[in-house]
Amino acid sequence: MLDSLLAIGGLVLLRDSVEWEGRSLLKALIKKSALRGEQVHVLGCEVSEEEFREGFDSDVNSRLVYHDLFRDPLNWSKPGEAVPEGPLKALRSMCKRTDHGSVTIALDSLSWLLCHIPCVTLCQALHALSQQNGDPGDNSLVEQVRVLGLLHEELHGPGSMGALNTLAHTEVTLSGKVDQTSASILCRRPQQRATYQTWWFSVLPDFSLTLHEGLPLRSELHPDHHTTQVDPTAHLTFNLHLSKKEREARDSLTLPFQFSSEKQKALLHPVPSRTTGHIFYEPDAFDDVDPEDPDDDLDI
């Protein structure tokens, strides 16, 4: 499960709730990235650095760069700055990293950032973070950037949620029952169809996962060859094919704007000596023609 979430770059959105917290899964993904040799940047907003690093071993902590916004979110400790930028400055500084190889950026949390940064500005910063691609001749840029964003979805309206969902390459929605947590994963890969899966897991104290089962949410992702195929034409309200009598009846019909032989002859072989126009009128079957009063059917 962790490997599938970390397989591609871009924004990975972890949506939790009051009942099912997502920080444990976030730290499990951070541990997995660090053990793969990646540099991990953490923008900590909701808990202290000591609390966040608790539970990680020395190998993981050595690869973890913590940007602390918990103690001084608005840069009040630096009175020399005329306009403290706070969290926005931290995000912009992370956009200018010079690390080599793949980099994982963890935002704890996006909900806190949404409370201090306008949604449009935050989305622009997230797009800049997740879309960094290095040039072949530039060794200072990273190969792949992965942004892990923890989002408390109950705190936000549909506008902010919709904007972040549009940016995300992978969406993880946490729920569950009793002591087991489920993660419903929507993964969008470039030039491929989106995939839906759900996993049941438990997070251990060392932030490793114990998987219980994986169930696809949509059966068409893994089709069962033993299931009966439904005929899509079985319950139509119209006929796809005509019988012989129906075809003959269709061919014998006169189209509404089909020219008669007299009109065709007059149009194709005009009389040279005729200088005045000629009006052809072919009444329909339902026309009420009254020679004495031709305007009788007009609603005046």
Swiss-Prot record:
It is found in: Nucleus; Cytoplasm. Transmembrane segments: none annotated. The gene is Elp5. Pathway: tRNA modification; 5-methoxycarbonylmethyl-2-thiouridine-tRNA biosynthesis. This is Elongator complex protein 5. Its main location: nucleus. The modification Phosphoserine is found at S252. Widely expressed with highest levels in testis. Expressed throughout the cerebellum. GO terms for biological process: positive regulation of cell migration; tRNA wobble uridine modification. It comes from the Eukaryota.
